[in-house]
Regions:
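Intrinsically disordered, low-complexity coil segments
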Residues: 3-6, 82-89, 217-221
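Glycine-rich beta-alpha junction loops
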Residues: 44, 98, 184-187
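Solvent-exposed alpha-helical segments within well-ordered globular domains of core cellular machineries
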Residues: 21, 25-28, 38, 42, ...
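Phosphate-bearing ligand-interacting subdomains
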Residues: 23-32, 130, 134-230
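HTH-adjacent hinge/linker in prokaryotic transcriptional regulators
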Residues: 34, 38, 43, 47-92
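Extreme N-terminal segment that seeds HTH/winged-HTH DNA-binding domains in transcriptional regulators
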Residues: 1-35
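Glycine-rich adenosine-cofactor-binding loop
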Residues: 85-127
Length: 230
């Protein structure tokens, strides 16, 4: 990664990063050619001031009275965070081929996203031989060799909870840049900076904690106040 770009990325807060990625996702799907921060606010439910702040944090100055150029803004966000555009693909793998991992074997899920699954791994050798997939499936013992030969950058971890930590450590050691963790396991500090936790149970608990005690009619006010404070 370009060192100067990395320093600039670190100056953007984590909440802003998350919002900007979601914003780019929305922009990539809209049919509008231009859009104002007020219009964006009506779609994503953040304040227009917060949206302008986030956009300014990546150095994008393309906003005028009639709004932002949608394509330029979307491209600027993707470029700033080195997110793969749909026209190019970053290679990924699935680690853990149980029920959840098997559901992800449908590569159509990732069509047009800029990410491509090129390999699957599981500690159970029999499972890799029985399952059918559009991409090769390997025993977990082959992770190091395949990640290197295929130049895989990202991994989706869907293994058993007890296998998650050693598999995550192995992936990072092999050069994986980031892991989407679908397990309930809490991964160690050596890999935590490269992990996005996506366990449905963890997300539901986090959501429950966030909305606990918030009346439905006050939820929108509370959410905007929280984002404005970030």
């Amino acid at each position: 990664m370009n060192e100067m770009l990395s320093v600039r990325q670190k100056r953007v807060s984590e909440p802003s990063k998350r919002r900007l990625v979601l914003l780019a996702e929305f922009l990539s799907r809209t049919n509008k050619a231009r859009i104002t921060s007020v219009e964006l606010a009506s779609f994503v439910h953040w304040s227009s001031a917060l949206i302008r702040h986030d956009i300014a944090s990546i150095g994008f100055c393309g906003g005028v009275s009639n709004g932002y150029d949608v394509r330029r803004l979307c491209d600027a966000i993707l470029r700033f965070f080195e997110i793969a555009p749909a026209s190019s693909e970053k290679k990924c793998c699935i680690v853990g081929l149980g029920r959840l991992g098997t559901a992800l074997l449908d590569e159509a899920i990732f069509d047009g996203t800029g990410y491509k699954i090129v390999a699957g791994f599981d500690p159970n050798v029999n499972r890799t031989e029985i399952l059918r997939s559009a991409f090769p499936l390997y025993p977990a013992s082959r992770i190091e060799a395949v990640v290197a030969s295929e130049r895989i950058e990202y991994a989706i971890l869907a293994s058993k909870n007890e296998d998650a930590a050693p598999l995550a450590s192995c992936l990072v050691t092999c050069g994986i840049r980031g892991i989407v963790n679908y397990t309930d396991a809490v991964l160690g500090s050596t890999v935590s900076a490269r992990v996005e936790n996506a366990s449905p149970v963890t997300l539901l608990r986090t959501l429950s904690a966030r909305v606990s005690g918030i009346a439905p009619e006050a939820e929108e006010v509370k959410r905007n106040a929280t984002f404005d404070a970030c």
